Regions:
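N-terminal cationic and glycine-rich segments that engage phosphates or anionic surfaces
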Residues: 1-101, 106-437
Length: 437
């Protein structure tokens, strides 16, 4: 494994991609420290300290601590994710967008452009809501959060937060295209990982004050290790459908006749469902947290992590996005047609429509299992943790994102190394981390 890491620096392109990604992630973390003008940071920090364990704390986790400081990156990448969700949903019902999706690279660029426009619009709406809400907020000590309220502050805040989100979106796209891994996922990953030392410090502080016992801390560590183990095991799990290729004679040579398989991942949607589900819930909740209206606050309290309504809503969105994302990224009809053209068939299943129906049936069952797995990982640890006042960063959602993104990034690095005939991180084919099929 050590030799595998050493091989990274022997491949110039891979080394350049990794350093490029790390450099942009450092730029992102620097931007998290730059506050929006006109805000009392101490007053805002005291409000977030009082909001620990609420949905506002979960939103702050996904922003990497930027919301707590109200930095220029306070909105994080969530407006971009929300815009992506809206565009993907519209693609299924709007003929023009569906046609663009089928046009290949040019169509994809056009949809990406629409996603960027949507990101800016959502950022303006969310930024304005936060600006107005901040003007009504006061710290527990009575200090006002906004030093000079008014339209100048609102306009400056909207412009700053929108520009910050647009810059994060650009960073993510650059990492995906010129770096290693998925840029958007890595930005969320870095935000969670960078906040974990703070969460560990908070846990030890609770331990020192006697609010939690040593037995609970040990139980928490065991639970975390078990959850990480389950995530690694399931994320690499596959259902392999056997495929046979008929023999064909071309000239004097015989082709085909070999046996292979069609790999279907148990969780083919990866970390997308919990990220999308969190984004949907957080968008209205973020604005609600900054608006001091009783009925709005009641809604915000109802969708607080650990509450049954929040967990039920979260699971519902996870199931929806597991099936929706799988349907968007994997088309059984196309797979069956390509298999038929290449002379392949599933033993006992007729090529063509019957093969597509069989693959769709298997995929639906696997997706159900994957959705149950993602829901259990995200919800069950969070329910237990919320009852013991432990930071969110040890919850299932954070662990699934961290481990899932790490596996995906390692898979890409491993693929680069094996393509250039270098040994991967783990010796032996069975031990290697397999990439998503």
């Amino acid at each position: 494994m050590i030799a595998g890491f050493a091989n990274i620096f022997r491949i110039p392109e891979l080394k350049r991609r990794i350093l490029f990604s790390l450099g942009l992630l450092i730029v992102y973390r620097i931007g998290v420290q730059v506050p929006v003008p006109g805000v009392d940071s101490a007053a805002l920090a005291s409000i977030f300290a009082a909001a620990k364990g609420t949905l506002l704390g979960l939103v702050d986790m996904f922003s990497g601590g930027a919301l707590e400081r109200l930095s220029v990156f306070a909105l994080g990448i969530m407006p971009y994710i929300s815009s992506s969700i809206i565009l993907q949903l519209l693609t299924a019902v709007v003929p023009h967008l569906e046609q663009l999706k089928k046009e290949g690279e040019q169509g994809r660029k056009k949809i990406t452009q629409y996603t960027r426009y949507g990101t800016v619009v959502l950022s303006i709406i969310q930024g304005f809501g936060i600006a107005v809400g901040l003007e009504t907020m006061t710290a527990p000590g009575g200090a006002a959060v906004v030093l000079h309220p008014g339209w100048s502050f609102r306009l400056l805040t909207v412009i700053t937060l929108t520009a910050g989100t647009a810059f994060i979106m650009w960073l993510g796209e650059q990492i995906t295209e010129r770096g290693i891994g998925n840029g958007i996922s890595l930005i969320i990953f870095s935000g969670i990982v960078c906040r974990m030392p703070v969460a560990i410090g908070q846990t030890f502080q609770l331990l020192s004050t006697g609010e939690i016992g040593i037995f609970l801390v040990i139980t928490l560590l065991v639970l975390m290790v078990a959850v990480v183990g389950v995530i690694i095991f399931v994320e690499q799990g596959q259902r392999r459908i056997p495929v046979q290729y008929a023999k064909r004679v071309v000239g004097r040579r015989m082709y085909g006749g070999q046996s292979t398989h069609l790999p279907l991942k148990i969780n083919s949607s990866g970390v997308i469902p919990p990220i999308f589900a969190s984004s949907i819930i957080m968008f209205p909740a973020t604005i609600a947290s900054f608006i001091n209206i009783p009925w709005v606050q009641a809604i915000s309290d109802a969708i607080r992590p650990g509450q049954w309504f929040y967990e039920l809503l979260f699971v519902g969105f996870i199931f929806f996005f597991c099936y929706f994302y799988t349907a968007v990224t994997f088309n059984p009809t196309d797979v069956a047609d390509n298999m038929k053209k290449a002379g392949g068939f599933i033993p006992g299943i007729r090529p063509g429509r019957r093969t597509a129906e069989y693959i769709d049936k298997v995929l639906s069952r696997i997706t159900l299992g994957g959705a149950c797995y993602v829901s259990a990982i995200c919800v069950l640890p969070s329910i237990l943790i919320s009852h013991f006042n432990v930071p969110f960063y040890f919850g299932g959602t954070a662990l699934l994102i961290v481990v899932g993104v790490a596996i995906d990034t390692i898979s890409q690095i491993e693929s680069h190394m094996l393509t250039r005939h270098y040994e991967g991180f783990l010796k032996g084919g069975a031990g290697r981390v397999r990439g998503r099929s």
